[in-house]
Amino acid sequence: DRLRSRGLGDVYKRQVPALIDVQTGKVVNNDYNRLTNYFEVNFREFHGENAPDLYPEELREEIDKLNIWLFHNVNNGVYKTAFARSKEAFWDAYNAFYAALDILEERLGHQRFLFGDYVTDSDVRLYVTLARLDIRYAFQLGHTKQRLIDYKNLWGYARDLYQIPAFKNNTYFKDFANPSNKKAGHLMETFNARFLDEINFDAYWGAPADRAHLSSDPGNKFKIGKR
């Protein structure tokens, strides 16, 4: 009986991201679209000193609009191709995904981050797809129109973000590259599966991004928030 359920976890299937009450073990929120915003606004008093403001009040409406667009065309765009059940659906999703990357490539040609000088919530959302694009999602896209490294601005932008410790320390390339559904003993393993330990991802992603000149505050990537 759903009315007698003790928490969201009793009603819905397990999925991520999810906010867990560590004292009760219950899922208290799994709103993937707004969860980061709750942390940025409602948990502000718990932020550390000099924590960045990823969701500045004056940009929230614009960030919300861009986040919706990013989700439908980029973040979920890859999965639309993967789960397409017809050629028409596949090519619609495929073309929309690469058209979105072209728009972002143009946008990032004249500003360091999506909203100018500082990293925002939108940059975090875009990064998670870019970090997986060449080493994981390319397999789902089939014919790859362009790799991330073929986009001058997007590739530099992705490296600029990666070189922030909070991004780098939470980017697990080996996990991205090694499919979770890999079958043990399968003779036809991917290049990544065969040579994963020999790939120095940091050598590629740690190369200079050369994007500081696009910012009016080149020494800082974050706008510091107020508690």
How should each PLM-predicted stretch be described?
Residues R159, I164-R227:
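Pan-eukaryotic secretory-pathway lumenal catalytic ectodomains of glycan-active enzymes
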Residues D1-Y12:
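Single conserved hydrophobic/aromatic residue that forms the stacking wall/gate
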Residues G9, R132, K152, G185-T190:
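Short alpha-helix boundary/capping motifs
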Residues Q23, V27-Y172:
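GST-like fold's C-terminal all-alpha helical module
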